[in-house]
Amino acid sequence: MAKKKVFISYDYDNDKHYKNLLLAWDANKEFDFSLYDQSVDVSVDSTDAGAIKRVISARINNSTYFLCIVGKHTHKSGWVAWEINKAVELKKKMVAVKTAKDNQSPSELFGIGAEWALSFTFESIKSAIERA
């Protein structure tokens, strides 16, 4: 299976472990999952927002899929909102998954044709990416 280029958008301060779980599934030969991670693995709290946006834009542009991990505080993240809008602008295949069903989704995910994984499980996320 060819690796799917996926930009993973998530609340760095609260949900990094979910991103790491996706990468662990990718690394485990027992899982039929192939992911080429394009996400930025640093906190984006910087005084040079323009430079950060250029790096993130290039990574999103180099991806085919955009996967938003919706954690408890994701809807409050200005960076995640910006990443979603950038991915839509760049016409990426949109996928979203909530870490808990009662998490509030970022409003930017509505009305953009995103495929939703019904739970944060390997099969559900894989299926949503395949449908996107």
Label the model's feature ranges.
Residues 1-62, 131-132:
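Conserved N-terminal substructure of TIR/SEFIR domains
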Residues 115-123:
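Short acidic-hydrophobic, aromatic-tinged amphipathic segments that line or gate anion-handling sites
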Residues 9-10, 70, 98:
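Short beta-strand/turn micro-motifs composed of small residues
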Residues 72-89:
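Conserved TIR/SEFIR loop-to-helix hotspot centered on a Trp-containing motif
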Residues 102-115:
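Glycine-rich, charge-decorated loop segments at or immediately adjacent to ligand/cofactor-binding or catalytic sites
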Residues 27-31, 86-94:
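Arginine/glycine-rich "motif VI" loop of SF2 helicases in the C-terminal RecA-like domain
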Residues 94-104:
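Short beta-alpha junction loops
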